[in-house]
From Swiss-Prot:
This is Methane monooxygenase regulatory protein B. Keywords: Monooxygenase, Oxidoreductase. InterPro entries: MethMoxRegMmoB, MOase_MmoB_DmpM, mOase_MmoB_DmpM_sf. The soluble methane monooxygenase (sMMO) consists of four components A/MMOH (composed of alpha/MmoX, beta/MmoY and gamma/MmoZ), B/MMOB (MmoB), C/MMOR (MmoC) and D/MMOD (MmoD). It comes from Methylosinus trichosporium. One of its GO terms (molecular function) is monooxygenase activity. The B protein acts as a regulator of electron flow through the soluble mmo complex, switching the enzyme from an oxidase to a hydroxylase in the presence of the substrate. Gene3D superfamilies: Monooxygenase component MmoB/DmpM (3.90.56.10).
Length: 138
């Protein structure tokens, strides 16, 4: 059997019948853990590499010091508490060519959190937009 925590037939998935039910419904497994963490996974490209280096790691980290960027072969894995925001207009200036929020969205592989676009900005947030904070137009 595999000992990996995220593999098939590992952990609780190794169990069947009563053993599975006992662990699945155990008191310690009935707790919801609150998290403000958000994740953005971007496919690598020349444009995205520049955006990661100059916008996310510099300006983004200045706004949100919890941002962590990991190189995952063909992808950039970005995690932060609260929110990750990328302004496509700023990216266009950096790249020296037109770059819309839709050009950015083509490279979005995965997200954890609530994703939305507003104007030229793409945001992943842990907030309930419209409930925790008003979503305003620009």
């Amino acid at each position: 059997m595999s000992s990996a925590h995220n593999a098939y037939n590992a952990g609780i998935m190794q169990k069947t019948g009563k053993a599975f039910a006992d662990e699945f419904f155990a008191e310690e497994n009935q707790v919801v853990h609150e998290s403000n963490a958000v994740v953005l996974v971007l496919m690598k490209s020349d444009e995205i590499d520049a955006i990661i280096e100059d916008i996310v790691l510099k300006g983004g980290k200045a706004k949100n010091p919890s941002i962590v960027v990991e190189d995952k072969a063909g992808f950039w894995w970005i995690k932060a508490d609260g929110a990750i925001e990328i302004d496509a207009a700023e990216a266009g200036e950096l790249l020296g060519k037109p770059f819309s929020v839709y050009d950015l969205l083509i490279n979005v592989s995965s997200t954890v959190g609530r994703a939305y676009t507003l104007g030229t900005k793409f945001t992943i947030t842990s907030e309930l937009m419209g409930l925790d904070r008003a979503l305003t137009d620009i």
